[in-house]
Amino acid sequence: MILSKPILLSAVQPSGNLTIGNYIGTMRHWSKMQNNYECLYCIADLHALTIQKNKIHLNKSILDTISFYLSCGVDPQKSIIFIQSHVYQHSQLNWILNCFSQFSELLRMTQFKIKSNCSKKINAALFNYPILMAADILLYQTNFVPVGQDQKQHVELTRNIAHRFNSLYGHVFTLPKPLITQHGSKIMSLLEPSKKMSKSDINKKNVIFLLDDIKTVISKIQNAYTDSETPSKIYYDIEKKPGISNLLEILSAITNKDIDILLKELEGMLYSEFKNIVADHLSKFLYKLQKSYNDYRNDEVYLKKIAYEGAMKSQLKSNKTLTKVYDKLGLIPLF
């Protein structure tokens, strides 16, 4: 008897150039995940509409994101890569789950609080964002969702909604679990290491973009915040050494070395020497990634073929869950 692999869903918004934080937090794990999980990789273009309405930019970003999936080792023969809006079941289940969600639950979502405090022009979709995320997850009977600490609350909300529905109608949804790595799941801003690195940061010197040219990467690392301790002391302590710790996280991820091993190699170095090492390794890493990315990105016919095949497979899987939901609620399916 062949045991089926647990199901894993990972989604990325096509809302602009991805960062080294995106890579270290999620993307670097994509290739290995295929060995242990049945993986679905989603380009969350509907989520992107909460903040982006530019047609040309969104269209380009969707194909960019598929290229990043492929360049990071996702194999379309092993996994499913699909565009969220191609699978209509996401929107259908989204509305149904809204009917089983509490207004007070959504008000407690930390990410919404942060974003609503930053702008008065908040649309309703941003408020309901976690419900669509729940639909994304529950449609595929997902067992695990790789997320950062900032998204963990959304997975917990998804579990609550699923449990609420199951309590009323019997077992329909699998309760998903967040998959969080110990190190590197949250890369911080280069100049302000007290806040998370974000591709939407106004100050681009805070962010390493995956498509930054090499000179820019070196400059950003060399100007990254460390501290004024004399003589230089390189050790890992997020509270006392946020800048140093952040650079150690980056170096550890791209070299595949434990931080403890790196600290022995870096012992006695000046901060400037440490930064040069980080910049050198990061530049070489990004050069290889960018070459692979560009090879895929230059073949849009292939990218659209991948998206089409992924949509067909995703619709078959998601429709099984949606049919169960319709049956439990007394809705009449089209077929």
Swiss-Prot record:
PROSITE patterns: AA_TRNA_LIGASE_I (PS00178)
Alphabetized CDD domains for the sequence: TrpRS_core
Gene Ontology MF terms in the entry: ATP binding; tryptophan-tRNA ligase activity
Sequence motif: 'HIGH' region, positions: 14-22
Presence of keyword Ribonucleoprotein: no
Binding site for ATP: Q13, P14, S15, G21, N22, G148, Q149, D150, I187, K196, M197, S198, K199, S200
Top class in the EC scheme: ligase
GO biological process: tryptophanyl-tRNA aminoacylation
Catalytically driven reaction(s): tRNA(Trp) + L-tryptophan + ATP = L-tryptophyl-tRNA(Trp) + AMP + diphosphate + H(+)
Pfam families in the cross-refs: tRNA-synt_1b (PF00579)
Localisation: Cytoplasm
GO CC terms of this entry: cytosol
Annotated HAMAP family: Trp_tRNA_synth_B (MF_00140_B)
Official protein name in the record: Tryptophan--tRNA ligase
Gene source species: Buchnera aphidicola subsp. Acyrthosiphon pisum (strain APS)
